[in-house]
Amino acid sequence: MVLANVDPRRSESISVLICDDAADMRELLVQIVGQRDGLHVAGEAADGIEAIAEARRLQPNVIVLDLSMPRMTGLEALPEIKRVAPAALVVVLSGFSASIVAADVLAAGADRYLEKGASPTLIRETIEGLVRTEARAVAPLMRG
């Protein structure tokens, strides 16, 4: 569990938890997220068990979750992540073809599925788009 780019003054920005067992992929995702104003990496996890613990502790806006991880896969961790961080939006980013696993991932509670190899722009736009969509859905309820 390595924390990166934690800045409590950035409460207005979108906090992102990066979960991937490959250190080089986590580093790449940290760079991708960090390149955009309004996004920051709140933390990192290297397996499903760490992902659950960090989701509980950090309560991020968005979790980027790999499927193939040791100790507990992303798919196994997903229901517990949604339980401990119910407001978090989950983007599964995996090397598996979308045609093979996307339906299962979305049925398990993920909000979006992207294949690894997606462009940095698509990854950032997916994260921001999810949060904007969620904000629009919640705003009428808050006005009450």
What are these regions (language model features)?
Residues M1-S15, R124-G144:
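Non-catalytic signal-transmission and effector/linker regions of two-component phosphorelay proteins
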Residues E12-V33:
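Conserved acidic segment of CheY-like receiver
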Residues C19-D20, A45, I63:
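Conserved sequence signature across two-component system core domains
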Residues D47-E50, T73-E76:
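Acidic catalytic/metal-coordinating carboxylates
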Residues L58-V64:
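Active-site beta3 strand of CheY-like receiver
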Residues M69:
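Receiver (REC) domain active-site loop signature in two-component systems and cognate sites
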Residues E76, S97-L114, A118-T121, E125, ...:
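Alpha4 helix (beta4-alpha4-beta5 surface) of REC/receiver domains from two-component response regulators
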